[in-house]
């Protein structure tokens, strides 16, 4: 059990028959009445975000999430196959479970699979990934007004805004949290 006064971003808790990750929290001490903690939580099973208020000092159960290093192997219809690097055990995850992460996954990529009491919750991506540009408009020389960008389609189908000097075939570093261009690889 952990006190809500000890909340921090990224903490995983078990509340109301669900597993929740703390995205944001704020301790509120009104002039009149008892203090409370206002929090923004993401359900690890469904991905939905919810705001919840706790009384100050209230205790909640801390959920111990296990992260296993795995390698993304291939897509098989509507499911995607991952392999544990140590035991060579393979697991399949449905497209709905990893819908957002699919835009960044390449074959043989190392990821972290989050599990809770044997149940697979989802995929945790690295902060950045390297993806190749498959389609973009050619850059025009002399068109160097400040911060000019153009859309580029990457090898996974993800479309990001990139500077005009980026050409097809180049490899880019993409931030997985925001889905934005960082730099050339």
From Swiss-Prot:
Gene3D superfamilies (alphabetical): 2.30.30.30, Nucleic acid-binding proteins
MF GO annotations: translation elongation factor activity
GO biological process: peptide biosynthetic process
Source domain of life: Bacteria
Subcellular location: Cytoplasm
UniProt keyword Acyltransferase present: no
Entry GO CC: cytoplasm
Keywords (A to Z) from UniProt: Cytoplasm, Elongation factor, Protein biosynthesis
Parts of the chain that traverse the membrane: none
Signal peptide annotation: none
Family that this chain belongs to: Belongs to the elongation factor P family.
Protein name: Elongation factor P
Species this chain originates from: Bacillus cereus (strain AH187)
Gene that encodes the chain: efp
């Amino acid at each position: 059990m952990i006190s809500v006064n000890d909340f921090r971003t990224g903490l995983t808790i078990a509340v109301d028959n669900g597993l929740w990750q703390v995205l944001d929290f704020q301790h509120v001490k009104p002039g009149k009445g008892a203090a409370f903690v206002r929090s923004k939580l993401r359900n690890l099973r469904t991905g939905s975000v919810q705001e919840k208020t706790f009384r100050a000092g209230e205790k909640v159960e801390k959920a111990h999430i296990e992260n296993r290093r795995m390698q993304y192997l291939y897509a098989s219809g509507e499911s995607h196959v991952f392999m544990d690097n140590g035991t060579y055990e393979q697991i399949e995850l449905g497209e709905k479970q990893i819908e957002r992460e699919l835009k960044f996954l390449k074959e043989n990529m190392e990821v972290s699979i989050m599990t809770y009491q044997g149940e697979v919750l989802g995929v945790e991506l690295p902060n950045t990934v390297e993806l190749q540009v498959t389609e973009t408009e050619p850059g025009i020389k002399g068109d160097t007004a400040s911060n000019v960008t153009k859309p580029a389609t990457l090898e996974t189908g993800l479309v990001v805004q990139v500077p005009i000097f980026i050409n097809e075939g180049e490899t880019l570093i993409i931030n997985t949290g925001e889905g934005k261009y960082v730099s050339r690889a």
